[in-house]
Amino acid sequence: MTAKERYLVTGALGCIGAWTCALLAEEGAEVVGFDFGTDDRRLRLVTHAEIPLVQGDIVDGKAFARLLDEHGITHVIHLAALLLPQIKPDPPYGTAVNIGGTVNVLDAAKTRGIQVAYASSAAVYSTADDVGAAVSNDAIGHPTTFYGVHKQACEGMARIFWAEEQVPSIGIRPWIVYGPGRDNGLTASPTHAMAAAAAGDDYRITFGGRTQLQYAPDTARVFIAAARAATEGARVFHLGGPVVSLTEVAAAIEAVVPGVSITVDEDTILPFPEEFDGAPLDEALGGIAWTPLQEGVSATVERLRAVRA
């Protein structure tokens, strides 16, 4: 980190965004959060630092460009997006936010010498891409949801902005992120189970099988590292991480909170491959340290208990 670094985190009030702001503030970096909403409960859950927040709509490209200049931004971590439950009632606006918003970020970066780290998603793939082994980093996906198609389009836009405008970018494809602040989206059920256990309640995780579970603070650190990495081109990487079964997750929660019952709906399997090859990202960023599952579950339950106290 240099003294001149100043970060803008879009989607700052989401789970990964809140953790990204918190970790940047913790290390003394200058960070500004940007979000359409005003509910800062996730940010307050993960940090006591006073993070400057700007409310705005990522769809307004001119306002976003002014924001970069007003705050002297040197790095953008673009996490703002609408998830599937928010897209389905209004697909045109969801598309404007997810694709148009990313275009606005890249367009604003092109004349300001800013590298962009942005969130893609494992949702750019589907069961059609399940090859019975880890999906390779350069495999072409066949998404089956609005969200997945949006994210695939964002990757394409980043490639065009590099080819035509030389805007460098790194896209990261998270899969199932868990931890404090993860309370929204199709794959939030493991964290919901931890929240239930923290309250002393039983819970049934809504899907089963094996998957890559990515601890939210670890995920945020990857985005920060990606924003700082010297790169040329429009690179995109699977986030990777350890593969675990949802029954292992349930057992880890029960080990932290004896007496609660955490079960798993093994009849429901998410329509995505279970593993993505994270080795290329690990190599590009010089190694990623993953928090062990039991440690991540314990820390999550502890923090959620503290909030209830």
Where do the language-model regions lie?
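A conserved pocket-lining segment of Rossmann-fold NAD(P)-dependent short-chain dehydrogenase/reductase
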Residues: 88, 140, 169-180, 192-214, ...
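NAD(P)-cofactor binding segment of oxidoreductase domains
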Residues: 70, 89-116
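N-terminal Rossmann NAD(P)H-binding glycine-rich loop of SDR-like oxidoreductase domains
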Residues: 7-27
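NAD(P)H-binding glycine-rich loop region in Rossmannoid oxidoreductase-like domains
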Residues: 58-97
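Conserved Rossmann-fold NAD(P)-dependent oxidoreductase catalytic core, especially the SDR/UDP-sugar
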Residues: 78, 103-146
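C-terminal substrate-binding subdomain of Rossmann-fold SDR/epimerase-dehydratase oxidoreductases
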Residues: 201, 206-209, 213-309
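Glycine/proline-rich active-site loop of Rossmann-fold NAD(P)-dependent oxidoreductases
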Residues: 152, 165, 178-191, 216-217, ...
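Conserved beta-loop-beta element that borders a ligand/cofactor-binding pocket
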Residues: 120-121, 155-180
